Amino acid sequence: MTLPQSPLLVELKNLSFGYGDRVILNDLSFGIPRGKVTALMGVSGGGKTTVLRLIGGQYTAQKGQLTFDGQDVGQMNVEQLYAARRRMGMLFQFGALFTDLSVFDNVAFPLREHTDLSESMIRDIVLMKLEAVGLRGARDLMPSEISGGMARRVALAR
């Protein structure tokens, strides 16, 4: 018998984290729904990056529970963390694009690195993603040639 999938892909329950005596997160609880784009917003220094590093397994919570697809992130081994990270996407405030790659190649990069897809399949997927974010016509441009808003859309497509 298979257990039903939780509607939450990521769940934090009563999570606490800090550096020495400095508390960064105290008793934080929330969930990220499966298949949804979710924004994490807050004041500067409020712990947003720390939360993302906890979810990605770079940090370990001092208290509470953090699960990704039902698995305790703190108990994952290296291979399980890599597998989980391949299923995550993070969009940074300034795009984090490779400055020496075109828009097309920035979007193609993770497909080339993490899949065995043919170049023709990668091309089709990249063009579909660029179309979805309204940037198909910008495929040959370099990051220095596009606006900040366009760079964020390229990062989203990636």
What feature does the model see in each segment?
Residues 41-43:
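The feature captures the beta-strand-to-loop junction immediately N-terminal to the Walker
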Residues 56:
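Helix-to-loop junction immediately C-terminal to a conserved catalytic motif
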Residues 71-72, 115, 119-138:
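Conserved ABC ATPase "signature" region
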Residues 73-89, 113, 119-120:
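ABC ATPase NBD coupling module
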Residues 100-110:
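Short coil-to-helix segment of the ABC ATPase nucleotide-binding domain corresponding to the Q-loop/switch region
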